[in-house]
Swiss-Prot record:
Membrane-crossing segments per the record: 544-564
This protein's encoding gene: Siglec10
Family matches, as InterPro entries: Ig-like_dom, Ig-like_dom_sf, Ig-like_fold, Ig_I-set, Ig_sub, Ig_sub2, Ig_V-set, SIGLEC
Consequence when changing residue 682 to F: Decreases interaction with RIGI
Residues carrying sugar: 195, 246
Feature: compositional bias, Polar residues: 641-652
Residues making up the signal peptide according to the UniProt record: 1-17
Location(s) in or outside the cell: Cell membrane
Domain remark from Swiss-Prot or TrEMBL: Contains 1 copy of a cytoplasmic motif that is referred to as the immunoreceptor tyrosine-based inhibitor motif (ITIM). This motif is involved in modulation of cellular responses. The phosphorylated ITIM motif can bind the SH2 domain of several SH2-containing phosphatases.
Region (Disordered): 602-656
Top-level taxonomy: Eukaryota, Metazoa, Chordata, Craniata, Vertebrata
Name this polypeptide is given: Sialic acid-binding Ig-like lectin 10
GO MF terms, alphabetically ordered: carbohydrate binding
Renumbered ranges of motif ITIM motif 1: 588-593
Organism of derivation: Mus musculus
């Protein structure tokens, strides 16, 4: 019987031609993760109708060495066949062998399952082991479930989360699902045949940044996936970090409200905010937006100030905003720097005249005017501003406001260099100006004397700018250095002083008018000399003496009247002790040169003889230029125009004329001596 079976088996497994009719189609390499389920598709073909065999068809899967008689199959459709112990319950022949389907299902894959597997078919006396086989490669379990959840959860709004584990064959057993996390309060139960699990809950702000885990448990293994919940909320925890020269500033309170930085340093301000969804960050200086971030970008925004300057001071605000709200913080940046842009504003006679920006400026000021100097600088911390001057003959009035220097009444003693100094702990700056006091001509009383060659007169005047000086003889003008047969004029000047000497070589007629004129841009002054030569007739000594005493009394009376009127006018106009001259004003002083007799005269008659023409200043002096009117401007610290100490000048009387002229041409001397001695000596009588 055994021999018959062997022969039949040989015939069935015999020649090569018959073996080619058997073929198995299966994947050569099959990979599976430990603990999971794997399905291996398989089909085969075999010769048909060689023998009519009604025996059942069995299929077997073996692993390892091809010796079916020495091993147990791992899976078969023959219920009477004993299976390998480790494969029981895990390997399953799912294919319908009658339909030549040899598909294999492996559950709970283990590391020991890694080997080669071949298939064998049996039907009665027909038995054949296919040469085609597959190799199972077992790998570590890395497959995880997938969790489907909204990216951002709205607080107070219900949310549904799905955990899904996918595999390729429905016959694989479903794992057991479980949820873990702070948001888990209720779990929906699902049958084990389902490959997903659903979790519903209502998120709150307390759930933000917490973990939610979905875990799958198989028979011996488990796998899980964890997600972090992101619950939407308005910006919070906004913070500003400060870096000086790329170094973090230590010992600063969180979100400082004030920051001091020295000019020239580099500064980096870093703004951060916590929000969900990410907020849009922006830096704002006052009302100007300096920079902003993208909502999908970083949660930080840096503001770079590589070279801090004075103009960078201000209120810097970092603002974070999303659809749920906003938050902001303001930093007051104070840039420290030494005094700079030092300048002086000059106000003369209560009007702003100019602004001085550099050193060594000469400032002309009219004597008697008010002057206000305001020194201004930019610095932080505020600079200590002070004034200093070289000449201290008269101490100027220092205003209570720093940097303001007031001179209510400028005098010549104030001339000199004024220096404004501004200083703070970071540095100092100075600016100087030279004060030049201008004033109109002031003439000293001229002197005249008779010399051997004729009359010699000297005239001097002082003013700034230096005045011009000339003589007027009758209708003629004598100036500079000039001479001819009738006169010689010599001119000299030194600083504010000018001097002119006149020598008259011609015979002098009666009532000859001689004057000395001086002027500059601020005014003019004239001193007149009335020459009264006597006639050659002689008079009695006694009469001349009597008349001389009478004339002397009359002269004294005239002087008293003139002085009283002058004092009354000065009292009504409240003039200062020093004459205050306006542009274009003229003062005329008169001096009379009269004979001085050696003997008493007799039978004198006095008859006044006024000049036959008006003052030459009315027609021959250059008219002063009108000053252009400046707009009124009251600078802080300068005196108000109503408190001006400048002496007012009468517009109705631009010229003041004070003179007294006496004519002695008709007085005759007593013939007690030679008439030639009558003009030998002269004396000076000055009337101001």
């Amino acid at each position: 019987m055994s021999l018959l079976l062997f022969l039949l088996s040989f015939l069935l497994d015999g020649p090569q031609g018959q073996m080619e009719s058997y073929f198995l189609q299966v994947q050569r390499i099959v990979k599976a993760q430990e603990g999971l389920c794997i399905f291996v598709p398989c089909s085969f073909s075999s010769p048909e109708g060689k023998w009519l065999n009604r025996s059942p068809l069995y299929g077997y899967w073996f692993k390892g060495i091809r010796k079916p008689s020495l091993s147990f199959p791992v899976a078969t459709n023959n219920k009477d066949k004993v299976l390998e112990w480790e494969a029981r319950g895990r390997f399953q022949l799912l294919g319908d062998i009658s339909k030549k389907n040899c598909s294999l299902l492996i559950k709970d894959v283990q590391w020991g399952d890694s080997t080669n597997y071949f298939f064998r078919m049996e039907r009665g006396f027909e038995r054949f082991s296919f040469k085609e086989e597959f190799r199972l490669q077992v790998e570590a379990l890395t497959q995880k479930p997938d969790i489907f959840i909204p990216e951002v959860l709205e607080p107070g709004e219900p949310v549904t989360v799905v955990c899904l584990f996918s595999w390729t064959f429905n016959q694989c057993p479903a794992p057991s699902f479980s949820w873990m996390g702070d948001a888990v309060s209720f779990q929906e139960s699902r049958p084990h045949t389902s490959n997903y699990s659903v979790l519903s809950f209502i998120p709150g702000l307390q759930h933000h940044d917490t973990e939610l885990t979905c875990q799958l448990d198989f028979s011996r293994m488990s796998t899980q996936r964890t997600v972090r919940l992101r619950v939407a909320y308005a910006p919070r925890s906004l913070a500003i970090s400060i870096f000086h020269d790329n170094v973090s500033v230590p010992d600063l309170h969180e979100n400082p409200s004030h920051l001091e930085v020295q000019q020239g340093q580099s500064l980096r301000l870093l703004c951060t905010a916590d929000s969900q969804p990410p907020a849009t960050l922006s830096w704002v200086l006052e009302d100007q937006v300096l920079s902003w971030s993208s909502p999908v970008g970083s949660r930080t925004l840096a503001l770079e100030l590589p070279w801090v300057k004075a103009g960078d001071s201000g209120h810097y605000t970092c603002q974070a905003e999303n659809r749920l709200g906003s938050q902001q913080h303001t930093l007051d940046l104070s840039v420290l720097y030494p005094p700079q842009d030092l300048r002086v504003t000059v106000s003369q006679a209560n009007r702003t005249v100019l602004e001085i920006l550099r050193n060594a400026i000469s400032l002309p000021v009219l004597e008697g005017q008010s002057l206000c100097l305001v020194c201004v600088t930019y610095s932080n911390p505020p600079a200590n501003v002070s004034w200093a001057w070289v000449t201290q003959t008269l101490i100027p009035i220092q205003s209570s406001e720093p940097g303001v220097l007031e001179l209510p009444l400028v005098q010549r003693e104030h001339e000199g260099e004024f220096t404004c100094a501004a200083q703070n702990p970071l540095g100092a700056q100075r600016i100087s100006l030279s004060l030049s006091v201008h004033y109109p001509p002031q003439m000293s009383s001229p002197s005249c004397s008779w010399e051997a060659k004729g009359l010699h007169c000297n005239c001097s005047s002082r003013a700034w700018p230096a005045p011009s000086l000339r003589w007027r003889l009758g209708e003629g003008l004598l100036e500079g250095n000039s001479s001819n047969a009738s006169f010689t004029v010599t001119f000299s000047s030194l600083g504010p002083w000018v001097n002119s000497s006149l020598s008259l070589l011609q015979e002098l007629g009666p009532s000859l008018w001689l004057s000395c004129e001086s002027w500059n841009t601020h005014g003019a002054q004239t001193t007149s000399v009335l020459l009264l030569p006597d006639k050659d007739s002689a008079t009695a000594f006694s009469k001349g003496a009597v008349l001389g005493f009478g004339i002397t009394a009359l002269l004294a009376l005239c002087l008293i009247v003139v002085i009283v009127k002058t004092l009354q006018k000065k009292g009504t106009q409240e003039e200062p002790s020093r004459p205050k001259l306006s542009r274009g004003s003229t003062i005329l002083d008169y001096i009379n040169v009269v004979p001085k007799t050696r003997s008493l005269a007799r039978n004198w008659k006095a008859e006044p003889d006024a000049p036959s023409r008006s003052s030459p200043l009315d027609t021959h002096f250059p008219k002063p230029k009108k000053k252009q009117k400046d707009p009124h401007f009251t600078y802080p610290g300068c005196p108000d125009p109503t408190s001006s100490s400048q002496v007012p000048v009468s517009e109705n009387n631009p010229e003041e004329l004070h003179y007294a002229a006496l004519n002695f041409s008709r007085l005759r001397l007593q013939e007690t001596q030679d008439p030639q001695d009558t003009y030998s000596d002269y004396t000076e009588v000055r009337v101001h």
